[in-house]
A protein has these predicted regions:
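Conserved beta-strand in the GNAT
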Residues: 42, 48-58, 69-74
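Conserved GNAT acetyl-CoA-binding A-motif
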Residues: 89, 96-109
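A short beta-loop-alpha structural element at the N-terminal edge
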Residues: 1-12
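Conserved catalytic-core motifs of GNAT/GCN5-like acyltransferases
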Residues: 107, 122-138
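Active-site rim helix/loop that mediates acceptor-substrate recognition in acyltransferases
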Residues: 16-46, 50
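Conserved acetyl-CoA pyrophosphate-binding loop and the N-cap/start of the following alpha-helix
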Residues: 79, 83-91
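A conserved beta-turn-beta hairpin within the catalytic core of GNAT-like acetyltransferases
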Residues: 58-70, 80, 132-135
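Conserved active-site tyrosine of GNAT-family acetyltransferases
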Residues: 16, 116, 121
Length: 146
């Protein structure tokens, strides 16, 4: 059974570093990690942290109203496909709804676009490149009507 709970920013770093920043010269600590409005979720299986995600209050000019950005979603390789990511996103939707947030958005790696689409996010605009990481799409979900 997988449990989702809030965790601290430093608890996300090992998995971010292993999954998202392996052989990439970019920081695994994000601007905004420690902001008061930011929250981080962890997925635990048998009390082991197997996946992480971070949600930061961040404005994107393509959307209006209150917004959060999803960053640093990562699942340890041996646990990918077990449902941890979906459970974290569903928990985030609940929390963001309680906060009356209008939009959740993210810069999704090409490899993750299908996953995000399955959990209810839509692509917006053309694909774009992030140096050292690769091609991405802006994706979003409307959480609460304005």
């Amino acid at each position: 059974m997988i449990r989702i709970k809030k965790i601290s920013a430093p608890e996300t770093y090992a998995i971010r570093k292993t999954v998202l920043r392996k052989n990439i010269p970019l920081p695994f600590q994000f601007l905004g990690d420690l902001d008061e409005d930011t929250f981080h979720l962890g997925a635990f299986k048998n009390n082991e942290l197997i996946a992480v995600s971070s949600f930061m209050k961040m404005h994107n000019a393509n959307f209006s109203g209150e917004q959060y950005q999803l960053r640093g979603m990562a699942t340890l390789n041996q646990y990918q496909g077990c449902g941890a990511g979906k459970l974290m996103i569903e928990k985030a939707f609940t929390l963001l709804n309680e906060l009356k947030i209008n939009y959740l958005w993210c810069n999704a790696r090409i490899a993750a676009v299908n996953f995000y689409a399955k959990v209810g996010l839509n692509t917006f605009g053309d694909k774009f490149e992030i140096e050292f990481v690769g091609e991405h799409y802006l994706m979003f979900k409307k959480i609460v009507n304005q």
